């Protein structure tokens, strides 16, 4: 029988069918090749939006810089970055007036964080531009390399382990006339293999010292590397995102800590909360506007869209905001917060890998690195690329483009939200001094504006005033893409509101299925996702039951663990059948061992091992959960583990799931082919770190391990701990006098060695 799909929606309000319009099934698009073109687009667009600003030259690096602040206001709707300083400061003052003490309290909270944050905060995060190697690296490695270079250049404040001391080193490094770095390089030589007598290429890794003068170092310290944003759904064109280096990251972190603290106190801010908490916050604002508009007023809501939010923001504006927010604070605190925007005003965008050329006739491929774009003959390029390169050439220095205006994606989400909320705050009647008033929601570049007025003319006037106020602060509401509707129906950060939030289930689709961590975690994550969606996303019981059956089927195919009594033949079926036949209580076998599925929608919260424990044969229990079993990883089994889920929009979310350590909680081994590459030096560093950390953990078992707030190095902490433990053990008779003396002697020797160093 054919079903007419439109019949499905007859009883459903349009908003509830929103899920069907989202591009979230199937694989998202990924980018291939270099991001150079996208980065040039960003740089050129940003300059175009601020083109009527003032040009200056950076005295240290010689980079040309464009400053649009207080520039001419646009006469038309074109997006522009000409924010007016006095307007921004006034908006901040009004924000403070309506929230007495908000800035002061946030500063006090932030000061506490600044003094306690450890430098290892910077190891969080994925790819980071490593200025010592001039390419991207995992955050922890980039930080290690930076600290190593700092120490070899005599910058040792970072040894305290506090982030603020590491930042002191960063500031001092910028005053140095030269900085010496170590670069890794590869030597190849042909040698004859003794056994096979064939010639083979032998690779050795060399390290060589290399000096950067002040200008080169500053350029690297101010560089943001760029890459293409992957897996963006619903877009035809890719776009560039930035990864800043370690010099900038710490300063940005403190600014964002302050801004986050402010956002938490603002009812219009969609950050830093998420999920149901965010929905509740938004629903409150809507309720407030609707209750006040019942009798005499009409109320409209704009589902807002801003044109190129990042490219029209300006770090100089953020500096003005920070200066105002921290106005009565200690000098050191104001200084440390003002460095991030200053660095961003002088930032350089690295153009990425460059362009790939191939000649069809000669079957040749060659890469033109970004450094060559400044003076290569343009006849090789097509017209659009030619235009891009011509435009960007005046800005190029050593393969990086000077990019003073604009903020790269995702750098100051919290602070830019504060700026947006300050405009929403101006909608109160005491500020508009007329019959219309507004309120709304802001989350980074996304906003929803609710306007109330006695009549349509008032609504129009309110929207116009909001639009013009935004222009004064360098925010460009897009008239083409924003949409106005009677209050009660709008969209904000992909939440659809229709007299209450509608579940947008399609957003969750990517997280259904088998994650691919290991058999144990995947089972747990799979059922947790279904459970969470029943709680948060209107996933009904029948659909959930179906999702569960599909998940189990998917899981069995992934791990080839079909039931022991099935006819399906896989690589594992021989072993699984054998286990099935020798098991008395077959219901006790885990699904991953060919057992039946005992999950239904009522018991999704129970880990599978616990669900089946009473049903298991004793010898199966013993094999499954035996601490001496060589296949069980006992690295760190917490009762709750975190899986990184990739939701449809927004950053990867941490999702908690129950973890029970069994033979199925294996951790796959690292691919060893890295040993033949220039990354080998990095691997050795990592192993050294691993050893140090393991040693440290032996001294401080997790129960007693509190991060030291005082300033002491790992070695000092370990030595003092060893002395305390030794004394306790000696006094309680657990160790002999000779052993005690030996430990004390070793501790003194270590301290002497440290002093000599």
Swiss-Prot record:
<feature type="short sequence motif" description="Nuclear localization signal">
    <location>
        <begin position="187"/>
        <end position="195"/>
    </location>
</feature>
<dbReference type="InterPro" id="IPR001407">
    <property type="entry name" value="RNA_pol_PB1_influenza"/>
</dbReference>
<feature type="region of interest" description="Promoter-binding site">
    <location>
        <begin position="249"/>
        <end position="256"/>
    </location>
</feature>
<dbReference type="InterPro" id="IPR007099">
    <property type="entry name" value="RNA-dir_pol_NSvirus"/>
</dbReference>
<keyword id="KW-0597">Phosphoprotein</keyword>
<keyword id="KW-1191">Eukaryotic host transcription shutoff by virus</keyword>
<keyword id="KW-0696">RNA-directed RNA polymerase</keyword>
<dbReference type="GO" id="GO:0030430">
    <property type="term" value="C:host cell cytoplasm"/>
</dbReference>
<dbReference type="GO" id="GO:0003723">
    <property type="term" value="F:RNA binding"/>
</dbReference>
<feature type="short sequence motif" description="Nuclear localization signal">
    <location>
        <begin position="203"/>
        <end position="216"/>
    </location>
</feature>
<protein>
    <recommendedName>
        <fullName>RNA-directed RNA polymerase catalytic subunit</fullName>
        <ecNumber>2.7.7.48</ecNumber>
    </recommendedName>
</protein>
<keyword id="KW-1035">Host cytoplasm</keyword>
<dbReference type="GO" id="GO:0000166">
    <property type="term" value="F:nucleotide binding"/>
</dbReference>
<dbReference type="GO" id="GO:0006351">
    <property type="term" value="P:DNA-templated transcription"/>
</dbReference>
<dbReference type="GO" id="GO:0019083">
    <property type="term" value="P:viral transcription"/>
</dbReference>
<keyword id="KW-0547">Nucleotide-binding</keyword>
<comment type="similarity">
    <text>Belongs to the influenza viruses polymerase PB1 family.</text>
</comment>
<feature type="domain" description="RdRp catalytic">
    <location>
        <begin position="286"/>
        <end position="483"/>
    </location>
</feature>
<dbReference type="Pfam" id="PF00602">
    <property type="entry name" value="Flu_PB1"/>
</dbReference>
<dbReference type="GO" id="GO:0039657">
    <property type="term" value="P:symbiont-mediated suppression of host gene expression"/>
</dbReference>
<keyword id="KW-1195">Viral transcription</keyword>
<dbReference type="GO" id="GO:0039694">
    <property type="term" value="P:viral RNA genome replication"/>
</dbReference>
<keyword id="KW-0693">Viral RNA replication</keyword>
<feature type="region of interest" description="Disordered">
    <location>
        <begin position="53"/>
        <end position="82"/>
    </location>
</feature>
<keyword id="KW-1104">Inhibition of host RNA polymerase II by virus</keyword>
<keyword id="KW-1262">Eukaryotic host gene expression shutoff by virus</keyword>
<keyword id="KW-1190">Host gene expression shutoff by virus</keyword>
<keyword id="KW-0945">Host-virus interaction</keyword>
<comment type="function">
    <text>RNA-dependent RNA polymerase which is responsible for replication and transcription of virus RNA segments. The transcription of viral mRNAs occurs by a unique mechanism called cap-snatching. 5' methylated caps of cellular mRNAs are cleaved after 10-13 nucleotides by PA. In turn, these short capped RNAs are used as primers by PB1 for transcription of viral mRNAs. During virus replication, PB1 initiates RNA synthesis and copy vRNA into complementary RNA (cRNA) which in turn serves as a template for the production of more vRNAs.</text>
</comment>
<keyword id="KW-0808">Transferase</keyword>
<dbReference type="GO" id="GO:0003968">
    <property type="term" value="F:RNA-directed RNA polymerase activity"/>
</dbReference>
<comment type="subunit">
    <text>Influenza RNA polymerase is composed of three subunits: PB1, PB2 and PA. Interacts (via N-terminus) with PA (via C-terminus). Interacts (via C-terminus) with PB2 (via N-terminus); this interaction is essential for transcription initiation. Interacts (via C-terminus) with human PKP2 (via N-terminus); the interaction competitively inhibits the interaction between the RNA polymerase subunits PB1 and PB2.</text>
</comment>
<keyword id="KW-0548">Nucleotidyltransferase</keyword>
<dbReference type="GO" id="GO:0042025">
    <property type="term" value="C:host cell nucleus"/>
</dbReference>
<dbReference type="GO" id="GO:0039523">
    <property type="term" value="P:symbiont-mediated suppression of host mRNA transcription via inhibition of RNA polymerase II activity"/>
</dbReference>
<keyword id="KW-1048">Host nucleus</keyword>
């Amino acid at each position: 029988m054919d079903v007419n799909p439109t019949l499905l929606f007859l009883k459903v309000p349009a908003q509830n069918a929103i899920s069907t319009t989202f591009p979230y099934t199937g694989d998202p698009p990924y980018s291939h090749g270099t991001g150079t073109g996208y980065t040039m687009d960003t740089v050129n667009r940003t300059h175009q939006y601020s083109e009527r600003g003032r040009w200056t030259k950076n005295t240290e690096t010689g980079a040309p810089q464009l400053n649009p602040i207080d520039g001419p206001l646009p006469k038309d709707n074109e997006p522009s970055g000409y924010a007016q300083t006095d307007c921004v400061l006034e908006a901040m003052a009004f924000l403070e007036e309506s929230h007495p003490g908000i800035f002061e309290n946030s500063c006090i909270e932030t000061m506490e964080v600044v003094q306690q944050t450890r430098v290892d905060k910077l190891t969080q995060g994925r790819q980071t531009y490593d200025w010592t190697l001039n390419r991207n690296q995992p955050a922890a490695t980039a930080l290690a390399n930076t600290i190593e270079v700092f120490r070899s250049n005599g910058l040792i404040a970072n040894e305290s382990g506090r982030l603020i001391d590491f930042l002191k080193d960063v500031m001092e490094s910028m005053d140095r006339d030269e900085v010496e770095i170590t670069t890794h390089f590869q030597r190849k030589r042909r040698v004859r293999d003794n056994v096979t007598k064939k010639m083979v290429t032998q690779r050795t890794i060399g390290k060589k010292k290399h000096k950067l003068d002040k200008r080169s170092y500053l350029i690297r310290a101010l560089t943001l590397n760029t890459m293409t944003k992957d897996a963006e759904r619903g877009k035809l064109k890719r776009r560039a995102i930035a990864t800043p280096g370690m010099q900038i990251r710490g300063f940005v972190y403190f600014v964002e800590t302050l801004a986050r603290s402010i956002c938490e106190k603002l009812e219009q801010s969609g950050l830093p909360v998420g999920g149901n908490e965010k929905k509740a916050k938004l629903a409150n604002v809507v309720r407030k506007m609707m209750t006040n508009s019942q009798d005499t007023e009409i109320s409209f809501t704009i589902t807002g869209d801003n044109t190129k939010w990042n490219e029209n923001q300006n770090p100089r504006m953020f500096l003005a905001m920070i200066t105002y927010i921290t106005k009565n604070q200690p000098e050191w605190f104001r200084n440390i917060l003002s460095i991030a925007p200053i660095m961003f005003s002088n930032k350089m965008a690295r153009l990425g890998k460059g362009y790939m050329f191939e000649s069809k006739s000669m079957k040749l491929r060659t890469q033109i690195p970004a450094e060559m774009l400044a003076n290569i003959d343009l006849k090789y390029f097509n017209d659009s690329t030619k235009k891009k390169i011509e435009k960007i050439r005046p800005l190029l220095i050593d393969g990086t483009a000077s990019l003073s205006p604009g903020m790269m994606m995702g750098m100051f989400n919290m602070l830019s939200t504060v700026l947006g909320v300050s405009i929403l705050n101006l909608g109160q009647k005491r500020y508009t001094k007329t019959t219309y008033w507004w309120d709304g929601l802001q989350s980074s570049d996304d906003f929803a504006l609710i306007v109330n007025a006695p009549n349509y003319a008032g609504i129009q006037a309110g929207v116009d005033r909001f639009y013009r106020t935004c222009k004064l602060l360098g925010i460009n509401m897009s008239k083409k893409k924003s949409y106005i509707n009677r209050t009660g129906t709008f969209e904000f950060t992909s939440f659809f509101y229709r007299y209450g939030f509608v579940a947008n289930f399609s957003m969750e689709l990517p997280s259904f299925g088998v994650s691919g961590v290991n058999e144990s975690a995947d089972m747990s994550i799979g059922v947790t996702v279904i459970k969470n969606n029943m709680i948060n996303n209107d996933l009904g019981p029948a659909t959930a039951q179906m999702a569960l059956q599909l998940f189990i089927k998917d899981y069995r195919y992934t791990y080839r663990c079909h039931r022991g009594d099935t006819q399906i033949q896989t690589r594992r079926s021989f072993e699984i059948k054998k286990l099935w036949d020798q098991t008395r209580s077959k219901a006790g076998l885990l699904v991953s061992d060919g057992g039946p599925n005992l999950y239904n929608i009522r018991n999704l919260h129970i880990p599978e091992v616990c669900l089946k424990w009473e049903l298991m044969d004793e010898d199966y229990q013993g094999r499954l959960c035996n601490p001496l079993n060589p296949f069980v990883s006992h690295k760190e089994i917490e009762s709750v583990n975190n899986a990184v889920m990739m939701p449809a929009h927004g950053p990867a979310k941490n999702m908690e799931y129950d973890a029970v350590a069994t033979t199925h909680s294996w951790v796959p081994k690292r691919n060893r082919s890295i040993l033949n590459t220039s990354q080998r030096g990095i691997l050795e560093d990592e192993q050294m770190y691993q050893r140090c950390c393991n040693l440290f953990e032996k001294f401080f078992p997790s129960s007693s391990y509190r991060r030291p707030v005082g300033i002491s190095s790992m070695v000092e902490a370990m030595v003092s701990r060893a002395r305390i433990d030794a004394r306790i053990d000696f006094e309680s008779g657990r160790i002999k006098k000779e052993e005690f003396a030996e430990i004390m002697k070793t501790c003194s020797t270590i301290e002497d060695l440290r002093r000599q160093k």
